[in-house]
Amino acid sequence: MPALSHYRSVSSLPSVDRSFLLIQRLRIHGSSSSFPESSPSASILSGADPLKCTVSGGSLAKWITGISAGSALGFLYWSSGSSDSISGLFGGSNLLSFADSSTPSVCGVKVGDLKPRSFIPKLSLPGYSSGFIFGDAYRRKIFFNYEKRLRLQSPPEKVFEYFASVRTDKGEILMKPADLMRAIVPVFPPSESHLVREGYLTGERNPGELRCSPSEFFMLFDVDNDGLISFKEYIFFVTLLSIPESSFAVAFKMFDTDNNGEIDKEEFKTVMSLMRSQHRQGVGHRDGLRTGLHMTGSVEDGGLVEYFFGKDGSQKLKHDKFTKFMKDLTEEMLRLEFAHYDYKRRGSISAKDFALSMVAAADASHLSKLLDRVESLSEHPHLRDMRISLKEFKQFDELRSKLGPFSLALFAYGKANGLLTMKDFKRAASQVCGITLSDNVIEIAFHVFDSNQDGNLSVDEFLRVLHRRERDVAQPIAKGLSRYFSDGWKGSKNCSSS
């Protein structure tokens, strides 16, 4: 009975050795043609290390390795919810998600200390890693397109949550003024930074500190002096910013329902409610009540209304004060946009960042081509080294507010004289719109919007991008705010004539 005697000899071995021997015996019986019978058993019985013998077989080692790797990854995923545990695990280094950081900050409230917005945080990887499959330029384009669709198609709650950078101890999500700008204006990450996106989704890691330029303007009507914007104030500002600058006077006439040259609080609230019904992000809040974000209250009950009508709401708002406020609000948003691109706080932005601000409003079908033209600025040293000041940035933005007459001037000149030169462009801006554009601004614009690279401006493409930005910020629905103010202007003229 050789098998029985062999079993008895094996039973005298330690339990671990017996287990490995049984595994080996099963493998030997199953594949006797491939492995000599004497080799494995002899090695074990002769006192050789059973683990080494098993590893030489290969399958058990792979099985154990797989379990170990899976357990390690599972532990990493579980522990990624705690910044302390992760930093300790990797020697104290900060970890970010695939999405990379939003915008690092130099001011205010630290967002890195805020609580995560999900019970299941995403697996994190080292921030600013050069080992991503796709380069930063490609990832910026992907995130930019996503954020643009988010602004135009998502409900206001989602837009607010994505771009807001502050969460209080009570769980309320708030915005800084720079967050408001990014939620409304399509912007690229600054070219002088390593950033690839402007916000983050629920469940992702907090992006650390967000860069936010301080805003004295928003502090004027900040009741609690924290410099932060609530969701109801966000809806309020989005609605006001949808009014074109050329329609400020028309807007006031619409507010002044009794035609006495002043606006009281009830008139203001009535027309604001109507305006929200014409705005895509405000349409869900026509009744003035906030839904979502676990908050309740009227959109009109905020610091701005108190700024307009006093604490008791009895003061009247005059035309001059309203018009000045609207112009200051528009200018402040422009300043925040410039500060966003002025990443190194030099008081000027690069030619590339200025070009990015111009093409950011382009539709998706034209964006890639325009971005290629922006990237080609680096091939021309005199363009690459140009810097644009805040004054030049504002002067170019004025063209958007006077796009109607400027468009007519460009098309009329093009039909009469053919190609449009830089001198013609500058003269049209000066004589028709009263705007003085610098040579640097015009040269960058001609380079970016020269579709066939013949040295001339593609007028259609240039004007289409400028017009699209105005439309995207307004985000009208149904007839649209432009029609709304047009009808209001006709009504006010009829009232005046009668």
Swiss-Prot record:
- What residues does the EF-hand domain cover? 216-241, 243-278, 329-364, 437-472
Q: Where does Ca(2+) 1 bind?
A: 222, 224, 226, 233
- Chief site of localization: mitochondrion
**Cross-referenced InterPro entries:** EF-hand-dom_pair (IPR011992), EF_Hand_1_Ca_BS (IPR018247), EF_hand_dom (IPR002048), MICU1/2/3 (IPR039800)
Transit peptide: which residues?
1-29
The molecular function GO annotations come to: calcium ion binding
Which biological processes are named by the entry's GO terms? Answer: calcium ion transport; mitochondrial calcium ion transmembrane transport; negative regulation of mitochondrial calcium ion concentration
Taxonomically, the superkingdom here is: Eukaryota
Gene knockout outcome: No visible phenotype.
Entry-linked SUPFAM superfamilies = EF-hand
Q: Write out the similarity annotation.
A: Belongs to the MICU1 family. MICU1 subfamily.
Job of this protein? Calcium-binding protein maintaining matrix calcium levels at low concentration. Regulates mitochondrial calcium dynamics in planta by restricting influx.
Q: What is this protein called?
A: Calcium uptake protein, mitochondrial
| Classification lineage | Eukaryota, Viridiplantae, Streptophyta, Embryophyta, Tracheophyta
